[in-house]
Amino acid sequence: MNIEEAKQRIEQLTETINYHNKLYYTDDNPEIEDYEYDKLFRELENLEREFPELKKDDSPTNKVGGTILEKFEKFEHPIAMYSLSNVMNEEEFLEFDNRMQKELNQSKIKYTVENKFDGLALELIYEKGKLTVASTRGDGQVGENVTNNVKMMSNVPKSIKEKKKLIVRGEALITKKDFEALNKEREELEEIPFANARNAASGGLRQLDSAESKKRRLKFFAYQIANYKDFDLTNEYKSMEFLSELGFTVEGVHPNIDAKKVLETYYDIQEKRSKMDYEIDGLVIKVDDVKHQEKLGFLSRAPRFAVAFKFKPEEKETVLKNIEVQVGRTGALTPVAKLEPVQVGGVTVSNVTLHNPNEIKSKDIRIGDTVVVIRSGDVIPKITRVVLEKRTADSKPFEFPKKCPVCGGDTAVTDGDVIVRCINEECPSKITRYIEYFVSKPAMNMERIGKEWIAVFTKSGLVKTPADLYKITRDDLFKFERMGEKLAGYMLESIENSKNTTLKRFIYALGIRQVGETTADLLAKYFTSIENFKKATIDDLQNIEGIGEISAKSIYDFLHNEKTLKLIDDLLASGVNPVFEKVVTVESPLTGKNVVITGSIEGFTRNSAKEAAERLGATVQSAVSKNTNILIVGEKAGSKLKKAQDLGVEIMEADEFIKLANG
């Protein structure tokens, strides 16, 4: 691979990994299996190692976790929270062990092994024996303050006998038993069951109502003391013992073992994990001696003295009863395997997406086959292969429909002969899925209009395009059964409120293929108005950093389609007013500088301080790096100050920043 090819591949991998990071860490809605994500991440690491001049400071390999939700107060961690590098097999673990031996000049390394819980990382801070702050990991530097919700967790000590400041790290999760009970309750209330325990745990911690959070039955499992230097703790196991003595739940710790014993422990727990009361997706292997840890230090996103040794996905056999082909908003025909329900990794699996006809053909999947199902990373189920020796003599290859299974319309193959799409613009399924997308939270945010009512509206013919939503009257709504005065009022209010929206949301809501939230934001910033956007040329689009050739063509084609242009005009005529949220900049000492803000600044929230810095012409970064020009320091500045001083970064005091911000 030459340098130009490497550059293109790195850009593709970066965009893909950032997309999946957002789904996993922020939206709690992963689309791909852990092992598929790990393959992408490993490929990016290898390319950046081979072509170091192409590595950017904002590469996913330098980042920890995801973005912070705006609804929560931000909390800056006193000590950075890191992620872990992965090893995927015995060979990679032994490579790690050999590296530790060489770097520590030791013939045998002692490790502490702990369960790698499949939940949400938390930090708990105790001062004078009282729990004062609990926060999520966030991006590793700044997390979300979820103290009130954490105090609702039954096994979190609200007070401890230790009076020194103590920073405890651990994982919030839901046990398998509680997860099953939680989903049973949701089904009884006719609510959609949670896909997995991690999503339920993460969503529970991010509830604004602590009473709702309490209903999730979250538990906290401690695994680290971040400020261990303040205590007489010489190894990992002593830290775990100390936490246990203080009343924290500590599970699955195997202390002071060598590499051979690590492997024995790994295979033993991998075999037994399905019988555990909680989900784990691997083991965490840490060099036991803290002096050795300090000598080894950290990489940009992970410690050098520890790795996550991931388990192989759990596999189960079951029978494929049917293949149903569903139609999405872009007309994509997606085959879904209907299975004899099977327990895999503590979850009942009855449906598995087969993605496209090629997957069915390449694996020769047939109705009636016995298939092997995995849940990689204990999240998303997937069929890996057919058990051919159990196939019946009368089985026949699956014939993918040549017509749309919903409307009977013609189909066409696109996207490199992979995706089959219904090309009938009047297809009921396409219309329904499109309206669902249009009203969704990241789009026009019509929170009072649910999927059930959208199906009713589209089936009746009341709504055929998104613009029809803005024509709905109270009389229209009262024609439907179960429609009351209160619900009708809520719906109409939700529709009316959506008219005042941002340009980014509006562009996203249009449903242009290849345009997600990030691309919509890039387009809004570049064009600044819907009228400018409508006039976009292919050159304009390709000039935008972050938008590739395929995305540019898709956007251009959308804007040169009479029907979609009419939709935009109809929406604007209905009173929809997409406004670009422009950041006005003024010349200042911050203009053109990369700036990081740490600590609290009087008169500013973290978000308003960021906006003020941007108005002064700065690019605000989340973490200090060699590319940071200025660190703005408020009260209770965290670890960023020391790092900035070590790197020789210019320090600006809060008073000076306040004067600049206030003009």
From Swiss-Prot:
<dbReference type="InterPro" id="IPR012340">
    <property type="entry name" value="NA-bd_OB-fold"/>
</dbReference>
<dbReference type="InterPro" id="IPR010994">
    <property type="entry name" value="RuvA_2-like"/>
</dbReference>
<dbReference type="Pfam" id="PF03120">
    <property type="entry name" value="DNA_ligase_OB"/>
</dbReference>
<feature type="domain" description="BRCT">
    <location>
        <begin position="585"/>
        <end position="663"/>
    </location>
</feature>
<dbReference type="InterPro" id="IPR013840">
    <property type="entry name" value="DNAligase_N"/>
</dbReference>
<feature type="binding site">
    <location>
        <position position="427"/>
    </location>
    <ligand>
        <name>Zn(2+)</name>
    </ligand>
</feature>
<feature type="binding site">
    <location>
        <begin position="34"/>
        <end position="38"/>
    </location>
    <ligand>
        <name>NAD(+)</name>
    </ligand>
</feature>
<dbReference type="InterPro" id="IPR013839">
    <property type="entry name" value="DNAligase_adenylation"/>
</dbReference>
<dbReference type="Pfam" id="PF01653">
    <property type="entry name" value="DNA_ligase_aden"/>
</dbReference>
<keyword id="KW-0479">Metal-binding</keyword>
<feature type="active site" description="N6-AMP-lysine intermediate">
    <location>
        <position position="116"/>
    </location>
</feature>
<feature type="binding site">
    <location>
        <position position="137"/>
    </location>
    <ligand>
        <name>NAD(+)</name>
    </ligand>
</feature>
<feature type="binding site">
    <location>
        <position position="422"/>
    </location>
    <ligand>
        <name>Zn(2+)</name>
    </ligand>
</feature>
<dbReference type="InterPro" id="IPR003583">
    <property type="entry name" value="Hlx-hairpin-Hlx_DNA-bd_motif"/>
</dbReference>
<feature type="binding site">
    <location>
        <position position="171"/>
    </location>
    <ligand>
        <name>NAD(+)</name>
    </ligand>
</feature>
<dbReference type="InterPro" id="IPR041663">
    <property type="entry name" value="DisA/LigA_HHH"/>
</dbReference>
<dbReference type="InterPro" id="IPR004150">
    <property type="entry name" value="NAD_DNA_ligase_OB"/>
</dbReference>
<comment type="function">
    <text>DNA ligase that catalyzes the formation of phosphodiester linkages between 5'-phosphoryl and 3'-hydroxyl groups in double-stranded DNA using NAD as a coenzyme and as the energy source for the reaction. It is essential for DNA replication and repair of damaged DNA.</text>
</comment>
<keyword id="KW-0862">Zinc</keyword>
<feature type="binding site">
    <location>
        <position position="286"/>
    </location>
    <ligand>
        <name>NAD(+)</name>
    </ligand>
</feature>
<keyword id="KW-0235">DNA replication</keyword>
<dbReference type="GO" id="GO:0003677">
    <property type="term" value="F:DNA binding"/>
</dbReference>
<dbReference type="InterPro" id="IPR033136">
    <property type="entry name" value="DNA_ligase_CS"/>
</dbReference>
<feature type="binding site">
    <location>
        <begin position="83"/>
        <end position="84"/>
    </location>
    <ligand>
        <name>NAD(+)</name>
    </ligand>
</feature>
<dbReference type="GO" id="GO:0003911">
    <property type="term" value="F:DNA ligase (NAD+) activity"/>
</dbReference>
<keyword id="KW-0234">DNA repair</keyword>
<feature type="binding site">
    <location>
        <position position="404"/>
    </location>
    <ligand>
        <name>Zn(2+)</name>
    </ligand>
</feature>
<comment type="similarity">
    <text>Belongs to the NAD-dependent DNA ligase family. LigA subfamily.</text>
</comment>
<keyword id="KW-0460">Magnesium</keyword>
<keyword id="KW-0520">NAD</keyword>
<keyword id="KW-0227">DNA damage</keyword>
<dbReference type="Pfam" id="PF22745">
    <property type="entry name" value="Nlig-Ia"/>
</dbReference>
<dbReference type="GO" id="GO:0006260">
    <property type="term" value="P:DNA replication"/>
</dbReference>
<keyword id="KW-0464">Manganese</keyword>
<dbReference type="GO" id="GO:0005829">
    <property type="term" value="C:cytosol"/>
</dbReference>
<dbReference type="InterPro" id="IPR001357">
    <property type="entry name" value="BRCT_dom"/>
</dbReference>
<feature type="binding site">
    <location>
        <position position="407"/>
    </location>
    <ligand>
        <name>Zn(2+)</name>
    </ligand>
</feature>
<protein>
    <recommendedName>
        <fullName>DNA ligase</fullName>
        <ecNumber>6.5.1.2</ecNumber>
    </recommendedName>
</protein>
<feature type="binding site">
    <location>
        <position position="310"/>
    </location>
    <ligand>
        <name>NAD(+)</name>
    </ligand>
</feature>
<dbReference type="Pfam" id="PF12826">
    <property type="entry name" value="HHH_2"/>
</dbReference>
<keyword id="KW-0436">Ligase</keyword>
<dbReference type="InterPro" id="IPR036420">
    <property type="entry name" value="BRCT_dom_sf"/>
</dbReference>
